[in-house]
């Protein structure tokens, strides 16, 4: 059982996933710092608040902190955009080689012609 576990852990996909999770966590902290320390103060200058996350509205005895939600939305948008750009960059570096439909048809046609020629010889 230990050998199976070792083989499972050392497979490329599992290691890639582990590295991705670790880098993702570090990147999330970086984006959070960017939003909290640079973007929020800029927005705060326009909404007369020290931090976007502290914006709230009180209805009755209930306090709705919509600023915290907006803060998380900004974090998500920045993270998603950077991941999108990263994936586009990686796809350009390592393009998938896909045969076009025309190439596939040409190969099929060549094979059929070879079969036809062999049948004619018989």
Swiss-Prot record:
It is a multi-pass membrane protein. InterPro entries: Mechanosensitive_channel_CS (IPR019823), MS_channel (IPR001185), MSC/AndL (IPR037673), MscL_channel (IPR036019). It is found in: Cell membrane. It comes from the Bacteria. The chain crosses the membrane at residues 14-34, 67-87. The keyword Membrane applies. PROSITE patterns: MSCL. Keywords: Cell membrane, Ion channel, Ion transport, Membrane, Transmembrane, Transmembrane helix, Transport. GO terms for cellular component: plasma membrane. One of its GO terms (molecular function) is mechanosensitive monoatomic ion channel activity. The keyword Transmembrane helix applies. Channel that opens in response to stretch forces in the membrane lipid bilayer. May participate in the regulation of osmotic pressure changes within the cell. Homopentamer. Belongs to the MscL family. This is Large-conductance mechanosensitive channel.
């Amino acid at each position: 059982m230990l050998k199976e576990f070792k083989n499972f852990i050392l497979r490329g996909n599992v290691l890639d996933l582990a590295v991705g999770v670790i880098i993702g966590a570090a990147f999330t902290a970086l984006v959070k710092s960017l939003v909290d320390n640079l973007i929020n103060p800029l927005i705060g200058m326009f909404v007369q608040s020290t931090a976007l996350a502290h914006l709230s509205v009180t209805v009755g005895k209930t306090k709705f902190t919509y600023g915290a939600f907006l803060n998380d939305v900004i974090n998500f948008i920045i993270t998603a955009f950077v991941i999108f750009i990263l994936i586009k960059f990686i796809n350009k570096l390592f393009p998938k080689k896909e045969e076009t439909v025309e190439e596939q048809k040409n190969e099929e046609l060549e094979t059929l012609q070879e079969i036809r020629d062999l049948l004619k010889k018989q």
